[in-house]
UniProtKB/Swiss-Prot annotation:
Top-level division of the source organism's lineage: Bacteria
Location (main, coarse): other
Disordered: annotated span: 49-80
Gene3D superfamilies membership: bacteriochlorophyll c-binding protein
Keyword Repeat: no
Keyword check for Ligase: no
Subcellular location: Chlorosome, Chlorosome envelope
Protein name: Bacteriochlorophyll c-binding protein
Domain notes: The C-terminal extension may have a role in proper incorporation of the BChl c binding protein during chlorosome assembly.
Composition bias, Basic residues: 70-80
A single cellular component GO annotation: chlorosome envelope
Function: Component of the photosynthetic apparatus. The light harvesting B740 complex binds bacteriochlorophyll c.
Biological processes per GO annotation: photosynthesis
């Protein structure tokens, strides 16, 4: 069959070209994802200080003085 020989020959070339195109596209995608992640990290660090460093306890969301006594005050009001 002539069609089968042509298909086997062209499919190998298409696979090779597609592999090269996929490698280039994946490199571009990974670069774009890394740039987006860096930009999002930079925006979060500038807009919400302490969100990326919430583990050390210096965030406005993680450590505020009202979080220390408000649950105790509500519980003591119901427990007396």
């Amino acid at each position: 069959m002539a069609t089968r020989g042509w298909f086997s020959e062209s499919s190998a070339q298409v696979a090779q070209i597609g592999d090269i195109m996929f490698q280039g596209h994946w490199q571009w995608v990974s670069n774009a994802l890394q740039a987006t992640a860096a930009a999002v990290d930079n925006i979060n660090r500038n807009a919400y200080p302490g969100v990326s460093r919430s583990g050390s306890g210096e965030g406005a969301f993680s450590s505020s003085p009202s979080n220390g006594f408000r649950p105790k005050r509500i519980r003591s009001r119901f427990n007396r």
